[in-house]
């Protein structure tokens, strides 16, 4: 007879209290740790990482719901009975393995007979666990759909999978940012006189003689097949080079920002903010990803030999993605040559969504997300099955299976962190539209407030200006425009204030972000010089000594920024 487990009526209260105290203590410590991390992100103005942390909390809450459902439904599910012939199909173990491990009675009856614990059976990880001490389905000549203990094991696996996925994404992101630190020195170099001289806009050169041309315009670039082969192997030897970074940076600035902003725009900071925003997507587990996890569980069936092909799927996908990203850079170089053999100044690449699969740069992010999850699934499944069923079990009973899973897990981690992720962070900026992260936090918040005010006034049907309704601009007036956040009003000298007051028209974007005298000034959304940022209220502007200000000028200002900064409105939202 099986030994029925004790209920809480037969358990000492001090034992229950100790267990509750330990669980509460661990839960509170985790809560405080997450709160501390969130506070640190806000202190460092890491808004995207703070959103990623919220995604992690949402995943933990989802795990809590799954745990609750598994606990509540454990008994009802274990009482669902199915015929024995159906239950005998799609097992992880072969019949020979099951007989050797559990005995012939297990195969004949289609179920595990609950027996008294045998000290000679200590190697078996299966517990003598039953919901109410016996199998109800056995009385009907059937087998339980999933036993109570099987549901408990599934519960543990789902938790391990989610934890591994989050940890895997964090490690990949951290290692990728470590690799990208060298880009800071490249960005600083663009501010030097030597760089300006080497990229003299009045200098004529052959496209093939430029550093970018010598790297990408070769004999193998004439054939698509040889170009794919070259790009495939190029990702292993300097996936992101200095010449590629500087050329793509120059092309991005020429395509999206005003002329003359190359020396002021921090492309590396923009990429960093964009990558942080993408991390909020990767760290989550979408319903589609959960469905893929269910399919992976289905492949662990005897005879499918999933250990021979499943670990290689993420490797193949990540290598194809890396080759595609290198292919995009090469195509940008070929487009330069198609326009002519001679270039003036630095080579200018032309970004476009047509370079990416299906015209969607975000599709590559989905593939990277899928690779990270698939690899995390492999390692999580290996750790869970080893914990539950010892190292050699039905899921990986061969030594080569164990070696393949571990080797592929480490290899894909290195490839994704040090090769594909930095390459993706750079090349994905070559789409038709730029990301909302082009603005720093100060400007982004100003735009949100401006949009909120404009939307509110449009809703109420009135404006703060005194112009007639028919001539009233559809955009907010100057006092509501974010232009007042892009310049300094406090620290300006008296001469600057005098010239500002004497101006016959309101200051434009090009007047706010200059540095020094005698230089061309321009609007710079990336400007980190906070001494040139000051908020002017409506009253300050209305009390200034230039009553001849044309109130329609904000419309021209808005058109100017739309012409220079082409943000995709479908991506740039103002949701709080």
From Swiss-Prot:
Membrane topology per the entry is:
Multi-pass membrane protein
State the residue spans of region: Disordered. Answer: 450-557
Biased amino acid composition, Basic residues: 450-462
| Segments of skewed composition (Low complexity) | 467-478
Q: Which GO terms describe its molecular function?
A: calmodulin binding
Region of interest: Calmodulin-binding: 441-462
Q: Which compartments is it annotated to reside in?
A: Membrane
Q: In this UniProt entry, which residues form the Cytoplasmic topological domain(s)?
A: 35-59, 177-278, 330-362, 427-576
- Transmembrane ranges, per UniProt, are 14-34, 60-80, 156-176, 279-299, 309-329, 363-383, 406-426
Phosphoserine PTM positions read 505
Alphabetical UniProt keywords: Calmodulin-binding, Membrane, Pathogenesis-related protein, Phosphoprotein, Plant defense, Transmembrane, Transmembrane helix
**Composition-biased stretches (Polar residues):** 488-503
* This protein's domain notes: The C-terminus contains a calmodulin-binding domain, which binds calmodulin in a calcium-dependent fashion.
Recorded family membership: Belongs to the MLO family.
Task: Please explain the role this protein plays, according to its UniProt record.
Answer: May be involved in modulation of pathogen defense and leaf cell death. Activity seems to be regulated by Ca(2+)-dependent calmodulin binding and seems not to require heterotrimeric G proteins.
Protein name per the record:
MLO-like protein 12
Look up and give the organism this protein is from: Arabidopsis thaliana (Mouse-ear cress)
